[in-house]
Amino acid sequence: MSRIGRLPIEIPKGVEVKVSPDNVVTVKGTKCTLEKKFPPIVNIEVKDNQVIVTRNGDDKEERAMHGTTRAIIANMVKGVTQGFEKTLEIVGIGYRAAKQGKKLVLNVGYSHPVEIEEEPGIEIVVEGNNKIIVRGADKEKVGQVAANIRRVREPDAYQGKGIRYAGEVVRLKEGKTGKK
């Protein structure tokens, strides 16, 4: 048995979990409702205020999906109650971020400002002009939006300028040594 997969998921108060016969899990909470379809090689059932994930066989794919399914459902339950957030920092002279309506506008050294649309279910907040916070209930979506923002201008290896996750350590390379 998978060490992660065999652990039951406690359902907190105010959260409702439903499993349809075709393995679609719907988690309804105080913030929103999340829905995801899982492959039929795992069995998902709700018993005694807990979600229990089991698998049919013991081949490699079923073992892998057992723990993965349990982790995704646990993240769905956490997402509808607390939510998830990723923080990004902008480092560089003249680099800044601003919010215009539902758009995030990044000035990060290009000849034009880069605009990123806010996705449904995701909230983008700009603190100051060099800190971006991405919030939402779906952990996968929050991470993907944050990665898309970071990809606009990844930290460069020589000066460290660019967009990075909060707490991310960028290893800087040493520049060329001049002629003597």
UniProtKB/Swiss-Prot annotation:
The keyword Acetylation does not apply. One of its GO terms (biological process) is cytoplasmic translation. One of its GO terms (molecular function) is structural constituent of ribosome. The keyword Lipid biosynthesis does not apply. Coiled coil: none annotated. GO terms for cellular component: cytosolic large ribosomal subunit. It holds the Pfam family Ribosomal_L6. Transmembrane segments: none annotated. Keywords: Ribonucleoprotein, Ribosomal protein, RNA-binding, rRNA-binding. PANTHER family: 60S/50S RIBOSOMAL PROTEIN L6/L9, LARGE RIBOSOMAL SUBUNIT PROTEIN UL6M. Belongs to the universal ribosomal protein uL6 family. This protein binds to the 23S rRNA, and is important in its secondary structure. It is located near the subunit interface in the base of the L7/L12 stalk, and near the tRNA binding site of the peptidyltransferase center. Part of the 50S ribosomal subunit. This is Large ribosomal subunit protein uL6.
